Structures are given as structure tokens and as C-alpha cells.
Amino acid sequence: MNQSFVSIATTIYPPSLQLKTLATLTSKSGGKTIVVGDQKTPSSWHETNISFFSLQAQLAEDPFTDFAKMLPINHYCRKNLGYLYGMRENPEWIYETDDDNLVSTEILNPPSLSSKETDHYIDNQGWLNIYDYTNILNGPELVGTVWPRGYPLELINDKFQKSDSREKFDYIEIQAPIANGLVDGDPDVDAIFRLTRSLPLQFEKLKRDLIICGGTWAPFNSQNTWWHKSVFPLLYLPVTTSFRVTDILRSYVAQSIIMKFDMGIRFFGPSAIQERNEHSLIGDFEQEIPLYLNSQKMMSEINSSIQTSDNIAQAQFMAYERLEKLGFVESNELSLLNCWIESIAKC
């Protein structure tokens, strides 16, 4: 069955208000909601308008059982199976979020794949702090002092000098097959920010969507993100990194490949509110250390590794091959990636 879009989340908790709201809005918009459980998820889990896959169902769900058995138990990357179940519905888009993110719009609609005359285009910027492009309604003095998880720490105090040569206001015809939205409340900042700053934050709606193009990099997460079917393979969450690294490292790989093939990434204003599940901030800090130390090196190495690639799948393998050689992922990551690609072919 063809769906306009499928919404994907994973959880270890009973059905939350956030997931119930997601399912309602997705259904009203003609989509389907899929939730992936784990060993800690209550065995009685059930919710109207949600297709739920327990751990037992995952291990028995042909044709993805091989991949399901390779994924570690009690691990966020079991969300990869949700993507595969979603792809099987043959949607145009996959929307992904988490069980502690409440969609704050009245309707949930996929973004535009093609650029629009109202978009704001940025290229050749280098690293971009997306939070610098919006005001903070409940703390205007914080503008310029907030940074997303995965943004290089050594660049936090650098002020981007806006210039006409770097910001394109004229219409550019480009496709943006990935779109990431801001999140109010407890947004995706790193543990250093959480340990030293105050939350919550409320962002002003962006006057226009931003599309970042070649030569510009901005980390994005798995909390409020749309993926077009043309780039579904790039949904792969690397398994052998920490929970706090996996989606950010994926974003480095995905945007490098997107821009290698002359596409862009759309960023849009706040459309969800996060009431964060319980975390150990010191534990988060420890998990995020690879990003604190190596974000620029990771991005540089990924970019250089894919220059001779001819297609997305080849570029993705080359990127993770380089990351494995440098020790940023473990030696079995390539086997997992190969099984992922084989599983996509079965959708």
C-alpha cells in the first residue's frame, strides 16, 4: 500500500501523549505510524492508529530477521528496523521523531522536495549554527549563545559574518530531500550546554525556511526530521557508536553525500516540543566526547572519502569505511551497513 508518509519512533515506555498525538496527526494527514519496541518496552504495548513491533515481532518479521538479529538489544539503533518497516509501505516520505517529542502543529504534512522562492539559501559557509538564525522568545539575550549537539565546540564563540556572497536570497532550483525542524522546550543541545545553561527555550518561527547547500554543514538529529524516498538508504543509524553520537554522525554522512550530488538540506521553524525523558547529564557528556573532540575531523574525512563515488550507496559505504579505519565506528559496522542495504532491497 502506498502512503504519502510514514511516521517512525521507538520507545521503551508505555504509550505517551506524544506518540498518541503523533498517531492522530499522522492518520489525519493520510499517513501511517510505526513504533519499534525493545526488551524494556511493556509487553502489553498497544495504541490505536499505531503499528507496534515488539522485540519478539522484530526477530520474526520476514524479510528483515537477519538484520534484526544483528542489532543489539536495548539500543536506540533498533529504530533502523522501523525505517525498513516504513519503507515497505512505499511512502514518498518518512518522518522520524522520538517518544518525548510532541508535534505542536495542527497538521503534519511533508515538506516541499523542491526549493521555493520564499526559501533562504546558504552555501560555502562552512559550519553553520542553525540556532543563530532564530530569536529566542523566552530569553532574547541568549541569541548567539546556543549551539546544537554535534556543532564543533571550538567554533561556538565564532560569530558568522553575514554577507551577500554567502547568503543567497535569489531563487535557486535545488532539491532538499532531508528536512529538519527546530524543537521548543528542551531542544537538541549537548550536555555541556545543559550542564551550564538554563532550559527551556522557545524559538521564534523562522521567517523563511533555510536550505543549506554545498560547502555548508549543520548537524541535525533524529527528533523532528523528514526523509524523501530518494535518500532512504541514508536513514541508517550507525550501530557501533554511542546513543548520543549515532544520529549526529549519520547527519555528517548524509549531508556530505547530499551535497556531493548537488542537493541541499532544509531547516524549518519549531514544530515540536520536547519534554525530555530522564537522562544522566554526566552520562550524556561522556557519550558525546567523540563529537566534542572530533566533529570537524569526522566531517572532513567523510567529505574527502566520497569524492570519487558515483552514487549514494557507494558514497555511504566509502564514508563508513573511512570512519571504520579511523576508529570512529567499530569493525563490524560495515557488515551491519551491508545487511541494511540488502534489507532495503527486500522492501
Please identify what each model-predicted range represents.
Residues M1-K32:
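N-proximal low-complexity "stem/linker" segments adjacent to membrane-targeting elements
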Residues D38-P91, T105-T118:
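Active-site-proximal specificity loops/subdomain of glycosyltransferases
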Residues A60-D66, T105-P238:
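Conserved catalytic core of nucleotide-sugar-dependent glycosyltransferases
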Residues I94:
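Short aromatic/hydrophobic "clamp" motif used to bind/position activated sugar donors
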Residues D100-V103:
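Acidic metal-phosphate-binding loop of nucleotide-sugar-dependent transferases
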Residues P219, T225, S242-M263:
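A short, conserved alpha-helix in the catalytic core of glycosyltransferases
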Residues V231-T241, K260-F285:
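Active-site donor/metal-binding and catalytic loop motifs
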Residues S271, G283-C347:
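Long, compositionally biased intrinsically disordered regions
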